[in-house]
């Protein structure tokens, strides 16, 4: 289970930030944002994904700071959920793209913004299913100030539309969720990158805590305990991170999870710093590793630095 697969770095004609990998119709796909555009690449074998040719599937000059895209196939059609702004971070919102196809490589067009009635800052949107309904989860601000990012959930009536009210289900509480943060000065407390994992009888959301600009970026998890999924009291936060730094693998975070249906193996992909945070977000790469569900809870191996942990 400890085998690590190198996915990408900034020398691979791709970006390692916020990696998203999925399997569909015989191929593994890697979706990423680079230079304010979205790209996909695919390969039949996971180990070959790093060398696959990239194809641009979306670009619009009016959007900037294009972050953390995810591709979800809903009713046999492909949708990309992505955070974008107009060049001002305060205007980051979630958008949905579509290509009217079940082929992920077909170019996408903008359907529109995922509109939440409070019109608050929003990034890192993802899809969650429970009880025959579809929900949207994301990282956002409670108010208008960049002091704290929380995890929210809200029901969807279709791939484009939120209904009802948003519910905050996680906010930074523990010391390990607040490292590198100030609660202001563009260093907000961080809960971001929510991603659902489905156990046999449990639903979990894995998220990232602490500053993504710090060596202490890590993964935490909240677990749905049953009842109303939109009641924050029905979500329980695990008191310790499930993935955190080692002496050589610093700042591991923003993960996505997927399965190889051919053999049932479970994988996650994440980014981390090449050396340390002093080189900023440019000095990062992405890895893929196997994980296990033990007693219906995600158990992740230690992160691996491709350039150091030989």
Where are these regions (language model features)?
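Carbohydrate-active catalytic/glycan-binding domains of CAZyme proteins
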Residues: 1-310
